C-alpha cells in the first residue's frame, strides 16, 4: 500500500504482538487501535495483522461505520488461485491457526483444497529482534521442520512479520513452492474499494503519512524503514488506550 498509493494519506498504528493472547484481549486491543484511527478521521481501515483479522475483525466491523479490510480473506483468495495441486500450507501465530480462519476461507472458495496449518510462535519475535543471519536461519529451519512431512505447493505467510523472513523461509521450503504474501492481494482489493466508493484523494491533497506504535518508537522506526524501504519514515509512540 505504501509503495503503490503514496498519494493517498496513510496512518499506521503498530500494537504489541497479539499471537499468544486470549480472544478477549485481542478484541480489546484491536478495538483500542481502531478507535485511535477513527479519531484521526480515516476513511477506510485495513487490518494488517492476521491475528486481529482472524479473531477480532467480525466483532469490530459491527461497531464501526467504516469498511474494514482484512488480510486473511485476501490471503485465502490468493492461495486458492495459486495452488495447482490443491494442497496449501499455512504458517501463522497460535491465535490465527487456532481460529482456523485460513482453512475456512480457503475451503469456502474451493472445498477440494487440503489446508495444513502450523503455528509458529518463534517467527514473529525473530523478525522483530532481527538477530544475526545464522541465528535467523537456524530458528526458521527448526520451526518449519514439520512442513517437510506434508505435500503442498503453496505456502501462505499468515503473519505480517513473516515477509521479513522470506529469504530464510524460501531457503527451507525451496524455490519450487509458491509463496503467498496476503499484502499483495490486500493492496489490489483496497484500490478497488477506494475507486468504487470514490475515496481517492486528489493529487494535490495532503499526503503526509503518520506512523504510530504502542511500543518503542526507535525500534519501530528502524523496522518500518527496512520493511518499507523508506528512510523518511518516523514512528511516534502513542497509548492507544487513551
Where are the predicted features?
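Single conserved hydrophobic/aromatic residue that forms the stacking wall/gate
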Residues: 1-13
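Active-site rim beta-loop-alpha module in soluble metabolic enzymes
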Residues: 105-173
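Glycine/small-residue-rich loop that forms an oxyanion/phosphate-binding "nest" at active or ligand-binding sites
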Residues: 37-95
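N-terminal beta-loop-helix "entrance" segment that forms/cooperates
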Residues: 10, 14-31, 125-131
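Conserved beta-alpha
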Residues: 69-124, 185-186
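ATP/nucleoside-binding phosphotransfer catalytic cores, i.e., glycine-rich phosphate-binding loops
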Residues: 204-242
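Glycine-rich, highly charged phosphate/nucleotide-binding loops
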Residues: 22-36, 135-143
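Short, flexible loop segments at boundaries between secondary-structure elements
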Residues: 76-79, 120-128, 177-198
Amino acid at each position: 500500500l505504501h509503495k503503490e498509493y503514496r498519494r493517498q494519506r496513510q496512518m499506521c498504528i503498530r500494537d504489541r504482538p497479539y499471537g499468544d493472547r486470549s480472544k478477549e484481549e485481542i478484541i480489546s486491543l484491536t478495538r483500542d487501535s481502531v478507535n485511535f484511527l477513527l479519531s484521526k478521521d480515516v476513511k477506510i481501515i485495513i487490518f494488517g495483522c492476521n491475528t486481529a483479522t482472524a479473531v477480532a475483525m467480525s466483532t469490530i466491523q459491527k461497531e464501526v461505520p467504516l469498511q474494514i479490510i482484512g488480510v486473511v480473506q485476501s490471503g485465502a483468495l490468493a492461495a486458492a488461485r495459486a495452488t495447482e495441486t490443491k494442497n496449501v500450507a499455512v504458517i501463522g501465530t497460535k491465535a490465527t491457526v487456532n481460529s482456523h480462519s485460513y482453512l475456512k476461507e480457503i475451503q469456502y472458495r474451493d472445498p477440494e483444497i487440503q489446508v495444513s496449518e502450523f503455528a509458529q510462535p518463534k517467527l514473529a519475535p525473530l523478525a522483530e529482534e532481527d538477530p544475526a543471519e545464522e541465528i535467523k536461519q537456524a530458528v526458521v529451519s527448526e520451526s518449519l521442520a514439520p512442513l517437510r512431512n506434508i505435500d503442498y505447493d503453496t505456502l501462505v505467510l499468515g503473519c505480517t512479520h513473516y515477509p521479513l523472513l522470506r529469504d530464510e523461509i524460501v531457503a527451507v521450503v525451496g524455490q519450487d513452492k509458491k509463496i503467498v504474501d496476503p499484502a499483495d492481494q490486500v493492496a489490489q482489493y483496497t484500490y478497488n474499494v477506494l475507486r468504487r466508493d470514490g475515496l481517492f484523494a486528489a493529487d494535490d491533497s495532503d499526503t503526509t503519512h503518520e506512523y504510530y506504535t504502542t511500543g518503542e518508537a526507535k525500534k519501530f522506526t528502524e523496522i518500518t524503514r527496512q520493511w518499507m524501504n523508506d528512510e523518511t519514515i518516523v514512528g511516534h509512540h502513542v497509548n492507544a488506550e487513551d
